[in-house]
């Protein structure tokens, strides 16, 4: 097999090939950094707005009773 008359990588094509080989890697790194930034920003916002009261869950099923209205009813629901 004979070699091509002009090599694939020379002074003219080297920068072109480096650009097209490095572009996907650079875009992938940029995408990873951007997604990590978005995920960290989302978790910071959710931490400040979420307030969970775990006290009712620590009680037994007979001790916890929901005292509120259901679908606009005025009287409270009885405890079990």
Curated annotation (Swiss-Prot):
GO terms for biological process: brown fat cell differentiation; positive regulation of fat cell differentiation; spermatogenesis; white fat cell differentiation. The chain crosses the membrane at residues 14-34. InterPro entries: Adipogenin. Keywords: Membrane, Nucleus, Transmembrane, Transmembrane helix. It is a single-pass membrane protein. The keyword Signal does not apply. GO terms for cellular component: cytoplasm; lipid droplet; membrane; nucleus. It is found in: Membrane; Nucleus. Plays a role in stimulating adipocyte differentiation and development. PANTHER family: ADIPOGENIN. Belongs to the adipogenin family. This is Adipogenin. The lineage of its organism: Eukaryota, Metazoa, Chordata, Craniata, Vertebrata.
């Amino acid at each position: 097999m004979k070699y091509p008359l002009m090599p694939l990588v020379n002074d003219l094509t080297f920068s072109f090939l480096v650009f097209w080989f490095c572009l996907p890697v650079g875009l992938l790194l940029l995408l990873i950094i951007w997604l990590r930034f978005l995920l960290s920003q989302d978790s910071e916002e959710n931490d400040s707005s979420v307030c969970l009261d775990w006290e009712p869950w620590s009680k037994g099923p007979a001790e916890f009773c929901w005292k509120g209205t259901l679908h606009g009813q005025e009287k409270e629901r009885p405890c079990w």
